[in-house]
């Protein structure tokens, strides 16, 4: 599926597309709630979850064959907690790299989901913990955080 990089609203765009094998995440994406929910054949994701994305519930839920590496650019307003529930339960596994976006976080430092002003490490660790809490027991997902980040 070719989605233009300028696309912002992707909620439910391919929800339940059981034959979808690969997808590119647009760099302008903001709302991605249930975009690829139930895409059971989805294996490959290109692009990254941009820091502009603040709505991503059930983004890849039920995508059991996800594999490779996906980067998520994170701010204090990022929530990915239910984005990967029941995902990557088959196949070779998925690695998610959480990268802190200090520039975008400065805009929302006191209004973020993680309780106001927090360090990059605190935000990334809280985000990682909230994501891992929603993985199914059979998920082959590894989350790492990018240590090369700057604080504002």
Predicted regions and their residues:
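Consensus positions within tandem repeat domains that build extended binding/scaffold surfaces
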Residues: 11-15, 33-37, 57-61, 81-84, ...
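Short, flexible/disordered intra-domain loops and linkers
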Residues: 105-116
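Structural signature of tandem-repeat unit edges
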Residues: 1-8, 18-30, 40-54, 64-78, ...
